């Protein structure tokens, strides 16, 4: 079972419907969560991209309250970030980075492939962890 299928199972267990290959009015929208339904864009190319977007939308399910589409609001931006952080921790995490290293992943591509995420998602998560912890931290 790949990462996308695992996330689909998690969503199903939580009573969340997933609409795959949705046509959004804007190509900039890759996913949307509303009322226990997650819609994923038809423009997502593969299961890895779908997994990254689904993880973030699940993060919104678990962490957001209300309609956060209007990103001009500081509170909505904070909730957007919380959903993204949930996805980073769920799909990558510090332990995942360590495991990738222990499995001899040598670069961003190998690490992303090992973790089942896109290089962009991994890079964004690494930026988040660097901002939070600096270049070094201890993990129990």
Which positions does each model-derived feature cover?
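Active-site hotspot residues in diverse enzymes, especially metal/ion-binding acidic/histidine motifs
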Residues: 1-140
